[in-house]
Amino acid sequence: MHSSALLCCLVFLTGVRASPGQGTQSENSCTHFPGSLPHMLRELRVAFSRVKTFFQKKDQLDSMLLKESLLEDFKGYLGCQALSEMIQFYLEEVMPQAENHDPDIKEHVNSLGEKLKTFRLRLRRCHRFLPCENKSKAVVQVKNAVSKLQEKGIYKAMSEFDIFIDYIEAYMTMKAQN
């Protein structure tokens, strides 16, 4: 089934590239996407550095939330799905709750969220994700752990955001090399 999905995706992408009049400005900006990736990741890291200490001090748990299995999912055939799910998870579940923990960090968490939204928008505009039918087991484990831990889970998820950025970088580097 995986090869048939890949074949459908390739046929679709070939048709998109062959369509006349599709040479838009966004398509042209996508040719520069791999070169702008380090800058976008640096922006995420700088934005996270403004809240990192706050959340890591509040994180009283010894266990890791973002485990090696998530990185392996990012590097595997479900990489597109795992990345998409994790971005959505941080934007819809973690960051909205994290903003409410302290008025002094709300603006910085919001800024980090906006940068992550911009990153997601550029990914969607410039890269077609392969259709993934299965959910990433590692992402499901992260979501379940955060849900179980409640408030402590938000601190944990935010304190490990830099690991998430590293996993994004590993995924994007792998995709750029293929």
UniProtKB/Swiss-Prot annotation:
SMART domains: IL10 (SM00188). GO terms for cellular component: extracellular space. Its main location: secreted. One of its GO terms (molecular function) is protein dimerization activity. InterPro entries: 4_helix_cytokine-like_core (IPR009079), IL-10 (IPR000098), IL-10/19/20/24/26 (IPR020443), IL-10_CS (IPR020423). PROSITE patterns: INTERLEUKIN_10 (PS00520). Glycans are attached at N134. Keywords: Cytokine, Disulfide bond, Glycoprotein, Secreted, Signal. GO terms for biological process: branching involved in labyrinthine layer morphogenesis; cellular response to hepatocyte growth factor stimulus; cellular response to lipopolysaccharide; chronic inflammatory response to antigenic stimulus; defense response to bacterium; defense response to protozoan; interleukin-10-mediated signaling pathway; negative regulation of autophagy. It is found in: Secreted. It comes from the Eukaryota. Disulfide bonds join C30-C126, C80-C132. Residues 1-18 form the signal peptide. Major immune regulatory cytokine that acts on many cells of the immune system where it has profound anti-inflammatory functions, limiting excessive tissue disruption caused by inflammation. Mechanistically, IL10 binds to its heterotetrameric receptor comprising IL10RA and IL10RB leading to JAK1 and STAT2-mediated phosphorylation of STAT3. In turn, STAT3 translocates to the nucleus where it drives expression of anti-inflammatory mediators. Homodimer. Interacts with IL10RA and IL10RB. Belongs to the IL-10 family. This is Interleukin-10. It comes from Callithrix jacchus. The gene is IL10.
